[in-house]
Amino acid sequence: MKIYKADFITSGVNPEHYPEPLLPEVALAGRSNVGKSSFINKLVQRKALARTSSKPGKTQTLNFFNINDEVMFVDVPGYGYAKVSKTEREAWGKMMEKYFTTREILKGVVLLVDIRHEPSADDVIMYDFLKYYDLSVIVVATKLDKIKRGQRDKQIAAIKRKLQFDGQDTFIPFSSETGEGVDAAWEAIYRHL
């Protein structure tokens, strides 16, 4: 996929902060430090469109990115980070719930999980939440380059089992380091638009 435009548009916590609903949106969700920013940067072939951090909990708002004037990526705060206050976590949860349940141009959600580990309880809750609201889900298993080839099938099966993965959704092993999964991710995203 040729990327000729990838721009940060705005951040928001309430609907009045969201950009005008002119482009279909795809949200990116996952645990803190699962690789959401690296995923975005790899897809758009930029090093720092979405800021990466070794410190979990960096994303605290909904961040909107215009990609090729065709789709808006919406990076949501990571969940499961223990060093954020309970009040702040609850506020993020309400912000994300409002976005996921009211944004009519939301076409799907990319749920990122770490392929090296079974999904956390928070990952399962998020997947169940998205399915409950009948949102299309693309599960992207990040950090593929961190496991041996022989472990891939076992890890994929464990993730699908733990999530009770719906076969109508898409599952993509992905590496921000090697680029494996980039084409499959774009194909899945465009199928949802």
UniProtKB/Swiss-Prot annotation:
CDD domains: YihA_EngB. Its cofactor is Mg(2+). GO terms for molecular function: GTP binding; metal ion binding. GO terms for cellular component: cytosol. It holds the Pfam family MMR_HSR1. Belongs to the TRAFAC class TrmE-Era-EngA-EngB-Septin-like GTPase superfamily. EngB GTPase family. Necessary for normal cell division and for the maintenance of normal septation. This is Probable GTP-binding protein EngB. It comes from Exiguobacterium sibiricum (strain DSM 17290 / CCUG 55495 / CIP 109462 / JCM 13490 / 255-15).
